[in-house]
Design a protein with these regions (language model features):
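Conserved catalytic core of sirtuin-type NAD+-dependent deacylases
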Residues: 1-227
Length: 227
């Protein structure tokens, strides 16, 4: 499981500031269905700016993304990457199967026909026409907002029940259901690891805790898993 901390060293700011604001916006205004209904232009502009940021030259996968992709490649079919992040740095770092439980900046969804358009690199607005049903005023960011059900939960729960090792990397340990994954994994007998800049709120639930930069600690942990 990876969170915002793994992408921080790639120039993607951790979304939520200490004052609870998201890039100077209230969470309710830019990350809820109600906020989108109230002011769709504000919400579209907010995510358009974040999507555009992914295309900046200085935003590149870092050593932690690359190390996890290497782990996946070394153990084909045995490593599931679940991320709370909405960027594409895991994929650009070489990862193949990534479960984006909170959606992706690079996909948009139609409220009318529920179709999802992947590899969406352009801006999206209320005027954007759905390529499938050809209606306007219905395209929204394919992001899981507060109050919405995260994606892939059935798959994730099955993988947790069958895993032998579970690691949470760069996560706050405060956002559910992801914060509860460690308890599920331990219940089923997995060895558990937390890798964070500093111990998270849920660090006591893990058997092994590594503190430091993701670009240092993750490659080191991957080496230990492969040896």
């Amino acid at each position: 499981l990876t969170g915002a901390g793994i992408s921080a060293e790639s120039g993607i700011a951790t979304f939520r500031a200490s004052d609870g604001l998201w890039e100077n916006h209230r969470v309710e205004d830019v990350a809820t269905p109600e906020g989108f209904a109230h002011n769709p232009k504000l919400v579209q502009d907010f995510y358009n700016a974040r999507r555009a940021r992914l295309h900046d030259a200085d935003v590149q996968p870092n050593a932690a993304h690359i190390a996890l992709a290497r782990l996946q490649q070394a153990l084909p079919g045995k490593v599931t990457l679940i991320t709370q992040n909405v960027d594409d740095l895991h994929e650009r770092g070489g990862a193949t199967e990534v479960l984006h439980m909170h959606g992706s900046l690079l996909s948009v969804r139609c409220l009318y026909c529920d179709s999802v358009q992947d590899n969406w690199h352009d801006d999206c607005s209320t005027e954007t026409v759905c390529p499938v049903c050809k209606r306007a005023h219905g395209m929204r960011p394919d992001i899981v907002w507060f109050g919405e059900m995260p994606y892939y939960m059935n798959i994730i729960e099955k993988r947790l029940a069958n895993c032998t090792h579970f690691a949470a990397i760069g996560t706050s340990g405060q956002v559910y259901p992801a914060a509860g994954f460690v308890a599920l994994a331990r219940e089923w007998g997995a060895e558990t690891y937390e890798i964070n800049l500093e111990p998270s709120h849920g660090a006591s639930k893990f058997q092994h805790i590594y503190s430091g930069k993701a670009t240092v600690e993750v490659p080191r942990w991957v080496e230990s898993m492969l040896n």
